[in-house]
Amino acid sequence: PAALNSELDKYTLYRTEPLNRERDGSCVVDITVGSDKATTLRFLGWLKATHDIVPGLGVFCRAALSQWAEQYAKALADKGLKYSSIANYLNGLAMVCQFVYQTYAVDAEALAMPTTPLDELLRLRGQVHSPLYRLLSPLLAEVARVLFFAV
């Protein structure tokens, strides 16, 4: 849809412009934005198929966002997707959500929650990232030990 393409074009500018007063952090390269946009399109397609929600970035303003993201992550895990990939998907959704929070009028219901849907989305990302971190921690410790004693 043209409206969604326009929203995603605005997201691209938001993330890639070297100077942007609304954005925390530095700009990113086009490939990063492309990944975020592809992830968002997959998520919006899943929302349309499972909840009959019209695709658009406005869903990121909704109080139910983190519930939908959790269901989506579980669906991806059930399909056998690795947690590292799910963490990347959730990170892309979190980046788009941050853009929406900076540039859209977020639902009052979402803002009144003890933790915002964005906060909960970031928690989900950390939870699927944690198993990978636990798996790699011994290896990273061994690499650090070797590097430390090699000096």
Model-assigned labels for residue ranges:
Residues 1-151:
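Charge-rich, intrinsically disordered N-terminal extensions
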